[in-house]
Amino acid sequence: MSDEYKDDPWHANGRVVLCGANAYDRKYYFNPEFNAVPDSIKRELNIISVLFTQEAGGIFTIVFENDGGISFVTDAEEDDITYDEVSAGLLVGQIRRTRTEILESLELFY
């Protein structure tokens, strides 16, 4: 990784974080690098992320991979007994099926 992104929470392992939500601090985060994304898509990303953490718990992030593809990353604190890994997996699949248009638009944007 280049030193340019060494202490940058939005860039890690060649990935660029677009947005995410954290059930522990009940916050939504959006990478300001993508402020040019239309507001309607920003709202959809907010809804997707927050609803995910309300349903499954933990931390949910949407990231751009090196190849421009989009990945969903889910994580939970080690001692979190409320995080539902099965629900998280099902929700990721549901998002991929129902939000195809937005995901494709974001990949083109990136």
Task: Identify the function of each model-found stretch.
Residues 52-110:
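Amphipathic protein-protein interaction modules
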Residues 2-55:
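Negatively charged, low-complexity tracts enriched in Asp/Glu with abundant Ser/Thr
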